[in-house]
């Protein structure tokens, strides 16, 4: 019996050692020479910074080695102002020096500290974020891109410290430079087409409003114009090209457009569906949403980023749910305008709900949840 217990203990110890070994290996990212793109997040470790400010040297020396945890598939902690440290070891198995681009594909992070470490020493570092001018970025891009070099048959450790007042998500990817530039060109073409489509919608419906003088066209124009500004801000494009050295302007544009979109969307839905004439309770609901959105617009001019974004997210959830509920009820009653409205807007409303769930950390960061 004693031998069996001892044998069981040895087996458990062996399994634990194997698990530790597997975790240690999987936390390193080995470069694949032929791969143009590799996901980094699932090879990354993180730790929450305690009350005292940590230094990169303390982490490099292993003073807090027991506090590192595995990230998993995606880095998304929702709305938090806490500081997080991230690290990943990039291993180069080839006999030649390799250069890659590490991209943090989320343009709304306030402060990012980047440290490139080899043999226990910081070889390169950068401090950037959307609270810093675009010129602070190692590469002038709408997201945050850091060049990383790996010696032949060697490794490089990357440390990141991230703080933000908004949604804390850090999608990490490693690119070959040529592949990144090619993907960026295609990305900008797609975004330009999207922005151009919104401009055409605004101009066309603006002319319709001037001819017909119907308020629904005016609110539709204002909704799409605000959507254009908001998406360009959220994607980091407006900051990159319009006011790259004025992060405070970029912040206010994002906050004000986030507040305005719920106001104009509520006015458009209320007018287009004729809610004030057909549904008394729904009319009170939408009037309340319009008043609340108006107050939020005023607050977005001077309130902090944290408070204003949370208010805008809460209102966006309420407006989306109200539109879906009222639209479906009116469509079920046979209202033709409601059927047209739901056919045109239901996918967008569902998409908004998915995107909001991503912002607050309920869904992981991905292309589909961010776009």
Model-derived features with residue positions:
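Carboxylate/His-rich catalytic cores and anion/metal-binding grooves
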Residues: 111-115, 218, 223-232
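Interfacial "cap-and-anchor" motif at the non-cytosolic start of specific transmembrane alpha-helices
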Residues: 229-271, 275-371
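First transmembrane helix
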Residues: 181-211, 310-330
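Juxtamembrane interface at the cytosolic side of transmembrane helices
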Residues: 201-226, 275
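N-terminal signal peptide c-region/cleavage motif recognized by signal peptidases
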Residues: 19-24
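Bacterial N-terminal signal peptides that target proteins for export
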Residues: 2-12
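Soluble non-transmembrane domains of integral membrane proteins
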Residues: 25-190
